[in-house]
């Protein structure tokens, strides 16, 4: 079994690929198979953002493994104007839906209830198959691998500091 504990920056060369759905890329513990058919065990640090398409991992034996977002069933949402698209995004955000935001479109995992809601709001909704790379969200925090310049990423949380008055 190829055992992986480390996330690393993207590399120009890799020995294997993992084709994973968004749900699988969100797990810190996972048993899966590489595209080459090798048994893989992921044992990543808990509490980190999901793996992203193109990110690399380093196995215990030193091999580099590239993460690929596997195509999955999505809803591709467009609207007649920016106001309607913003309204659709607001309603999806209110439901804490994982959402990929593009220039003039939104994408979310296929869900017939959300599709009906979006159509009721006047959005055009198309079922597609594509890789899914949603936003990390307001509480996702910074993501980096380098230890150089850590002070640049040491942001104190400002939301929900109850009892603190400035």
Swiss-Prot record:
Record-level Gene Ontology MF annotations: nickel cation binding; unfolded protein binding
Subcellular location: Cytoplasm
GO biological process, one term: protein-containing complex assembly
GO CC annotations on file: cytoplasm
Name of the protein: Urease accessory protein UreE
SMART domains on file: UreE_N
UniProtKB keywords: Chaperone, Cytoplasm, Nickel, Nickel insertion
Protein purpose: Involved in urease metallocenter assembly. Binds nickel. Probably functions as a nickel donor during metallocenter assembly.
Gene from which the chain derives: ureE
SUPFAM superfamilies: Urease metallochaperone UreE, C-terminal domain, Urease metallochaperone UreE, N-terminal domain
UniProt family annotation: Belongs to the UreE family.
Matches recorded under InterPro entries: UreE, UreE_C_dom, UreE_N, UreE_N_sf
């Amino acid at each position: 079994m190829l055992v992986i504990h480390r996330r690393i920056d993207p590399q120009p060369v890799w020995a294997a690929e993992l084709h994973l759905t968004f749900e699988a890329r969100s797990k810190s513990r996972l048993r899966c198979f590489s595209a080459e058919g090798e048994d893989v065990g992921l044992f990543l640090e808990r509490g980190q953002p999901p793996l992203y398409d193109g990110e690399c991992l380093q196995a215990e034996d030193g091999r580099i493994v590239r993460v690929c977002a596997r195509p999955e069933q999505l809803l591709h949402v467009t609207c007649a104007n920016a106001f309607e698209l913003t309204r659709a995004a607001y309603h999806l955000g209110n439901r804490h839906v994982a959402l990929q935001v593009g220039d003039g479109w939104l994408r979310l995992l296929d869900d017939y209830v959300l599709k009906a809601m979006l159509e009721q709001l006047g959005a055009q909704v198309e079922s597609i198959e594509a890789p899914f790379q949603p936003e990390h969200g307001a509480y996702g925090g910074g993501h980096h691998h380098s230890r150089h310049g850590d002070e640049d990423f040491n942001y104190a949380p400002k939301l929900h500091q109850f009892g603190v008055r400035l």
